[in-house]
UniProtKB/Swiss-Prot annotation:
Changing residue 349 to A: No effect on interaction with TACC3. It comes from Mus musculus (Mouse). Changing residue 718 to A: Impairs interaction with GATA1. Strongly impairs interaction with GATA1. This is Zinc finger protein ZFPM1. A zinc finger (C2H2-type) spans 303-327, 333-355, 361-384, 868-891.
Length: 995
């Protein structure tokens, strides 16, 4: 006690500057600052005050006489005054213990109007701060039930802290100081100049608004700090809640943390969170922020997350898009088997492996059977994983007045928009008209160009009627045939076919970088609002906003329903009677958008992409020049040329001429029209034959298709007859040639590449006009052989087909009898002539006949020939010699063209070889000929297929070695299909490069 009494005068005599320099004075200080002992942190930082404190002495403590000249007298005076000082000190201590004031010496506690308040002992400058103090500021809601408005925030400090004694005000104008939070501590700062004796009114703020201008207390200066929220990295849920809490009205029983967006039921839990877990605790010196502020790698195309609480940098736009899904909760990739949703494609593909492990090679969703797990996995990725990563805002335009926005996947509009990427067809009456730029883009992508229709031709694509099941996004044939490189039925002065149904707008898609997958991001763009199925969308679905969309559970239920409906759709007319097809009414296989071919089997799709797709072409063969004969219908002879006499056709004897007469049933079909085989009516054009929705049988390949669209695709891309070039007609008719013609003539001039199945000489030359051949038409039962499914059905209907009609520019049907080359046809091989290479012998041939003859007679790798079997003879009957000779002599059948009479004089084998059978084998009729053929071979030369029912004949594939590929172990029912296989698809061509 005495030491403290003695030290008191010494401390008062020292200047405040000396007090700042000496630490021992702080320990022995007995001034009212010592009463702040409950706050252990306050004395350490309270000591450096503002400059005005240096020349102002605390008035509460009386200053003893100062006489530095006589220290002895001063000590004597102290000894004399000691009892009185002791009494005063004791009184002061008692008053200090009784008084609740524990604040700084610049302030004092006062009573005004019966209320405690704090006033300034001396003038306080703006920017003066006190702190730090242990506590926090809690946001409180304004209760509407309270009559008196209270503060929106609450000060939470220790009960003994003097900050609780400061009267609080709500407005900044009424306050001259503020309490704010900084670095997990509370600070009190003077915001306005307070005169001596003035009262302090404090306002609670969550963060400082202005920078203090006090030059001494720079450590407490919050001016250079950014708002707390910008340095906090919150979770997406916290960020959203924190943005709401900034302006939210909070109940009294809820204690939220505005920085983190977390609500607490107890104030103690909130305090613990604020002290130890709050995100605002992260400051520059903390280890968490140190890890945040470490230098990050920079990328040339770096993207930054727009969320202010996240600010994650992504190396690319795609990675930013994937990252943004973590904020929005978007899961655009859906497994259609179990309806699981994923944020990234990789996760969805990884999930699909679960189904490959459990399905044992069978897709339980669509019944697809695969031999390996990899093929099944590719099938699942291609067909049972919805969506591709990409900006859906680029492929959906809600309208002219609305900007393109990215729709969330849990909305109906987003799901329907995405499903358009996989929908097969868009009806013409609902689909928007794509812009010309988009059309040109689609045309180049599909590997063909389109020209406008000629002479009133149908500008739209004739497609199957709506009663036929729509399984694939195939563009109908007439639209394809209108391109410059298409051998379609588009010819000058062509009228629309009466059988053409309503046009259908076909969705155009681009090929994806992933084989068999859906289009890549941004690849599908259309102008206007896309068509959306009516049974899913409302009429005003184009303007449907996202907030009114149904829940995600409804979307998943709709997806499940669509999947089950798709599984229940059979091969019949699922779209009949106006039944909507659905979003997933397309084929269960895969579609090659470059070739516009849809496969029901994923294996066929991959084989097509690897071996036959038009995208495999060499770079020097661009898609736009693949088919140089655009609308060059005049390149063929005019309509009147159908009756010109052809010297090469005028063989000696009436029999061949009668053959020509009866063989001209349909000049367009006979001359290699695309619909040449099986014309429905003699006078119908090729357009009528090909566009007939009921036509599904390819007689050249003996394949019957379930849909007309598949049939047209087959005729365009895969038919054995499509590779035959339209031969040029002779410039002028000549006299009849000699009795014999060369066996192998020069191939015709090629006008495009990749027509190389049957290089028949002058196939399609006009029939002779001179002589009695064109006039009489023998109603022989064999006249209907090439075009009728039943060889025994006799008909005299082909006669009207002799009327002149334009010959279409199309391939030749192999099931018809080829015509010989005119002797004056050009013999020089063009630069792009076909060549055929024998892999085993490394010998190239420019003629298919020479190549087949080599493979038949000379090639050591050729399979051993078995004895040919005649389909019209008993099963044990053997054919001596050539099967073609046997059919012509024994049964009176002309393989490719019907004979005029059973006893017609046959031509020499050398003359028949290039015309009837290039390899000595007779191409069979694609129809079940044995049903109406004679069973007795004894009546040779007089029997025709209409003589009576035959004996049981071998199966169509039982034609011996004629239709059996030993290397591939495949038996064919049609010779033309077998030849096409040997030329294009056989495994022996794996190492060849056939131009």
């Amino acid at each position: 006690m005495s030491r403290r009494k003695q030290s008191n005068p010494r401390q008062i005599k020292r200047s405040l500057r000396d007090m700042e320099a000496g630490e021992e004075a702080k320990a022995m200080d007995s001034s009212p600052k010592e009463q702040e002992a409950p706050d252990p942190e306050a004395p350490a930082i309270e000591e450096p005050p503002s400059p005005p404190r240096e020349d102002v002495s605390p008035p509460a403590v009386p200053a003893p006489p100062e006489s530095p000249e006589d220290p002895e007298d001063m000590e004597g005076q102290e000894l004399e005054m000691r009892p009185q000082d002791e009494e005063k000190e004791e009184k002061e201590e008692e008053a200090a213990m009784a008084s609740p004031w524990s604040g700084p010496e610049e302030l004092e506690l006062a009573l005004q109007d019966g209320q405690r308040c704090v006033r300034a002992r001396l003038s306080l400058t703006e920017g003066l701060s006190w702190g730090p103090f242990y506590g926090s500021i809690q946001t409180r809601a304004l209760s509407p039930e309270r009559e008196e408005p209270g503060p929106a925030v609450t000060l939470m400090v220790d009960e003994s802290c003097w900050l609780r004694m400061l009267p609080q005000v709500l407005t900044e104008e009424a306050a001259n100081s503020e309490i704010y939070r900084k670095d997990d501590a509370l600070w009190c700062r003077v915001t306005k100049v307070v005169p001596s004796g003035g009262l302090l009114y404090v306002r609670l703020v969550t963060e400082p608004h202005g920078a203090p201008r006090h030059p001494v207390q720079e450590p407490v200066e919050p001016g250079g700090l950014a708002p707390v929220h910008t340095d906090i990295q919150l979770l997406p849920q916290q960020a959203g809640m924190a943005s709401i809490l900034a302006t939210a009205v909070i109940n009294k029983d809820v204690f939220p943390c505005k920085d983190c967006g977390i609500w607490y039921r107890s104030e103690r839990n909130l305090q613990a969170h604020l002290l130890y877990y709050c995100a605002s605790r992260q400051r520059a010196g903390s280890p968490v922020s140190a890890t945040e502020e470490k230098p990050k790698e920079t990328y040339p195309n770096e993207r930054v997350c727009p969320f202010p609480q996240c600010r994650k940098s992504c190396p690319s736009a795609s990675s930013l898009e994937i990252h943004m899904r973590s904020h929005s909760g978007e899961r655009p990739f859906v497994c259609l088997i179990c309806l699981s949703a994923f944020t990234t494609k990789a996760n969805c593909e990884r999930h699909l492996k679960v189904h490959t492990d459990t399905l044992s090679g069978v897709c339980h969703n669509c019944g697809f059977i695969s031999t390996t797990r990899d093929i099944l996995y590719s099938h699942l990725v291609t067909n049972h994983m919805v969506c591709q990563p990409g900006s859906k805002g680029e492929i959906y335009s809600p309208g002219a007045g609305h900007p393109a926005a990215k729709l969330p996947p849990d909305s109906l509009a987003g799901f329907q928009q995405h499903s358009l990427m996989h929908s097969p067809l868009v009806p013409a009456d609902k689909a928007p008209t794509p812009s010309s730029g988009l059309d040109s883009k689609a045309e180049v992508t599909n590997g063909e160009t389109r020209v406008p229709p000629q002479n009133g031709g149908s500008s739209e694509s004739p497609a199957a009627p709506r009663t036929i099941k729509v399984e694939a996004a195939e563009e109908p044939e007439a639209t394809r045939a209108s391109g410059p490189g298409e051998p379609g039925p588009q010819a000058p002065s062509r009228t629309p076919s009466p059988h053409s149904p309503n046009p259908v707008r076909v969705k155009t898609e681009l090929s994806s970088p992933t084989p068999g997958s859906s289009p890549g991001p941004g690849e599908l763009t259309m102008a206007g609002t896309l068509f959306l199925p009516q049974y899913v969308f409302s009429p005003d679905a184009g303007t449907t906003t996202v907030p009114t969309a149904p829940q995600a559970s409804e979307i998943l239920a709709k997806m499940s329903e669509l999947v089950h409906n798709r599984l229940q759709q059979g091969a019949g007319s699922s779209g009949a009677a106006g039944t909507p097809t659905g979003l997933f009414s397309g084929t269960k296989g895969a579609t090659c958008f470059e070739c516009e071919i849809t496969f029901n089997n994923i294996n066929n799709f991959y084989v097509h992409k690897r071996l036959y797709c038009s995208g495999r072409r060499a770079p020097e063969d661009p898609p736009t020049v693949r088919r140089p004969k655009a609308a060059t219908g005049p390149a063929r002879a005019p309509a009147g040329a159908a009756a010109e006499p052809d010297p090469s056709r005028s063989s000696p004897g009436p029999g061949p001429r009668e053959e020509e007469a009866s063989g001209t049933t349909t000049p367009e079909a006979e001359a290699a029209g695309r619909g040449s085989e099986g014309s429905q009516s003699p006078g119908s054009s090729v357009d009528d034959a090909e566009d007939d929705p009921s036509r599904t049988l390819c007689e050249a390949c003996n394949i019957r298709f379930s849909r007309h669209e598949t049939y047209t695709v087959h005729k365009r891309y895969y038919c054995a007859s499509r590779h035959d070039p339209p031969p040029r007609r002779p410039p002028a008719p000549t006299t009849a040639p000699g009795p014999a013609a060369p066996a192998l003539t020069a191939p015709p001039v090629r006008t495009r590449r990749r027509r190389k199945l049957y290089e028949l000489p002058a196939a399609g030359a006009p029939p002779p006009a001179a002589g009695p051949a064109p006039v009489p038409v023998v109603p022989s039962p064999t006249a209907e052989l090439p075009s009728s499914p039943r060889p025994g059905s006799a008909s005299a209907g082909p006669a009207p087909a002799l009327s002149p009609s334009p010959v279409p520019d199309g391939p030749i049907d192999l099931s018809k009898r080829p015509r010989r080359q005119s002797p004056d046809a050009p013999t020089a091989l063009p630069a792009l002539a076909d060549y055929h290479e024998c892999t085993a012998c490394r010998v190239s041939f420019h003629s298919l006949e020479a190549y087949l003859a080599h493979k038949k007679y000379s090639c050591p790798a050729a399979p051993l020939r078995t004895t040919a079997l005649c389909p019209y003879c008993p099963p044990n009957g053997r054919v001596r010699g050539d099967l073609v000779e046997h059919l012509r002599q024994a049964h009176g059948l002309q393989v490719a063209k019907p004979a005029a009479s059973p006893g017609a004089e046959p031509r020499t084998p050398a003359e028949r070889a290039p015309r009837d059978s290039p390899d000595g084998r007779a191409p069979r009729s694609p129809s079940p000929a044995p049903e109406n053929t004679p069973s007795d071979p004894a009546d040779q030369g007089a029997r025709t297929p209409s003589k009576g029912p035959p004996a049981p004949a071998p199966a169509p594939g039982g034609g011996g070695g004629h239709r059996y590929c030993r290397l591939c172990n495949i038996r064919f029912s049609s010779l033309s299909t077998f030849i096409a296989h040997k030329k294009y698809y056989c495994s022996s061509h794996a190492a060849e490069h056939v131009k």
